[in-house]
């Protein structure tokens, strides 16, 4: 089952989230387990399975990074696991710089300003990289798909670092 076909939307990194949500609600109404309360046990089980598949598809397409990964997997792009090291030394250096920047927030004289700076840098770099990956996915050739895969891993790093920023902010301001 192709998730894009299921929701009758074009395969693209950019998805109309309102259309996706509308299609999701329509599909869920047709297979909702409550509709099958008086059906046979097998029909109930099938309805539950279809409902779960629709939920999985919706959650995947709703999230930009999961959507990108899904597109690349559908194109048979080999996705390295999280433990596979980056070959991009400049990005490895950038990771260290960003982590140092985050650590410096704790020792900053103006924690608010330092946090805003980190958040701004992460947001800007995430958006720029996202735009590059969007273009690579739309090109859909071996080289662009491979590059999109590398950029997806970088975007996942930014996403995780943003979570760390949120945790740091919570810990600094909960005291």
Curated annotation (Swiss-Prot):
Q: Per the database record, which ranges form the J domain?
A: 2-74
User: Entry's InterPro entries?
Assistant: DnaJ_domain, HscB, HscB_C_sf, HscB_oligo_C, J_dom_sf
Q: Which Gene3D superfamilies match?
A: DnaJ domain (1.10.287.110), HscB, C-terminal domain (1.20.1280.20)
Q: Which GO terms describe its molecular function?
A: ATPase activator activity; protein-folding chaperone binding
- Which GO BP terms sit in this record? [2Fe-2S] cluster assembly; protein complex oligomerization; protein folding
Q: Name one GO cellular component term.
A: iron-sulfur cluster transfer complex
Q: Which UniProt keywords apply?
A: Chaperone
Chain segments annotated as transmembrane: none
> What is this protein's function per UniProt?
Co-chaperone involved in the maturation of iron-sulfur cluster-containing proteins. Seems to help targeting proteins to be folded toward HscA.
Q: Which family does it belong to?
A: Belongs to the HscB family.
Q: How does it assemble?
A: Interacts with HscA and stimulates its ATPase activity.
Q: What is this protein called?
A: Co-chaperone protein HscB homolog
Task: Please tell me the species this chain comes from.
Answer: Colwellia psychrerythraea (strain 34H / ATCC BAA-681)
- What gene is it encoded by? hscB
